[in-house]
Amino acid sequence: MSGGKGKAGSSEKASTSRSAKAGLTFPVGRVHRLLRKGNYAQRVGSGAPVYLTSVLEYLAAEILELAGNAARDNKKSRIIPRHLQLAIRNDEELNKLLGHVTIAQGGVLPNIHQSLLPAKKAKAGNASQEL
């Protein structure tokens, strides 16, 4: 008689996470839990955490790619807050999204006002053309 809870005859497959099903690296289950516990709404649909997780993963990848480029431009192999600051402030859309965000140890963008720069000298060739 085989009527028990034995493993014989059962074809259990390993459970796959919602992150793996969606092809994401960020945790869908954790985002779903945070949405439920955060009192954002009484109920949270099953697609909302997947969509939000994919958006968060995309933003993180975008910022890290630009920060990696900034680190490489400065001949560094490690991303520091300064590189994050440069990446965000030099990108128009990210700067608009994170305009009021302060990044600790980020510094400021290098900027010299035009009136403080030395005046350009006129070329000698221009005087002969006016005659």
From Swiss-Prot:
PROSITE patterns: HISTONE_H2A. The keyword DNA repair applies. A motif ([ST]-Q motif) lies at residues 128-129. Keywords: Acetylation, Chromosome, DNA damage, DNA repair, DNA-binding, Methylation, Nucleosome core, Nucleus, Phosphoprotein. The modification N6-acetyllysine is found at K5, K7. CDD domains: HFD_H2A. Phosphorylated to form H2AS128ph (gamma-H2A) in response to DNA double-strand breaks (DSBs) generated by exogenous genotoxic agents and by stalled replication forks. Phosphorylation is dependent on the DNA damage checkpoint kinases MEC1/ATR and TEL1/ATM, spreads on either side of a detected DSB site and may mark the surrounding chromatin for recruitment of proteins required for DNA damage signaling and repair. Gamma-H2A is removed from the DNA prior to the strand invasion-primer extension step of the repair process and subsequently dephosphorylated. The keyword Methyltransferase does not apply. GO terms for molecular function: DNA binding; protein heterodimerization activity; structural constituent of chromatin. The [ST]-Q motif constitutes a recognition sequence for kinases from the PI3/PI4-kinase family. The nucleosome is a histone octamer containing two molecules each of H2A, H2B, H3 and H4 assembled in one H3-H4 heterotetramer and two H2A-H2B heterodimers. The octamer wraps approximately 147 bp of DNA. In contrast to vertebrates and insects, its C-terminus is not monoubiquitinated. Core component of nucleosome which plays a central role in DNA double strand break (DSB) repair. Nucleosomes wrap and compact DNA into chromatin, limiting DNA accessibility to the cellular machineries which require DNA as a template. Histones thereby play a central role in transcription regulation, DNA repair, DNA replication and chromosomal stability. DNA accessibility is regulated via a complex set of post-translational modifications of histones, also called histone code, and nucleosome remodeling. This is Histone H2A.2. The gene is HTA2.
